[in-house]
Design a protein with these regions (language model features):
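Acidic, proline/glycine-enriched N-terminal capping motif
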Residues: 1-119
């Protein structure tokens, strides 16, 4: 499945959900909510789904560990996905957030419908 988006945010449909890649990292978590929300509104229109979801958020960085709280980043990104990927963030049954050293500064989000989740 091919990626959509030419700027900082790209996304693609995957089985049961969506995968999002955001290039670069800033220390301001609130920066990500409008960035991702507008991307879904303008470039990657999908209908939100019901049922339980599993979300994996990985922040990759190069060099020093960024001064960005993962919990604030997760909240901003989940708020941006609400109404696009899932109807409400209360549908998230499993959430994994991780910060790892990587090859470049980026954030990856994978949100998939839970296989044995409720409808």
């Amino acid at each position: 499945m091919t990626w959509t988006g030419k700027g900082k945010v790209r996304a693609r449909a995957i089985e049961g959900g969506v995968e999002i890649a955001i290039d670069g990292i800033t220390t301001q978590a609130r920066y990500y909510k409008p960035l991702v929300y507008e991307f879904f509104r303008k470039e990657f229109e999908i209908r939100p789904r019901y049922g339980e979801f599993e979300v994996e958020l990985i922040m990759e960085y190069v060099g020093e560990v960024p001064q960005l709280d993962l919990d604030n980043l997760a909240k901003a990104l989940l708020d941006a996905l609400k109404g696009h990927v899932f109807v409400d963030d209360s549908q998230i049954a499993r959430l994994l957030c991780e910060r790892v050293a990587g090859e470049r500064d980026r954030i990856s989000v994978r949100a998939v419908k839970r296989v044995n989740g409720s409808e």
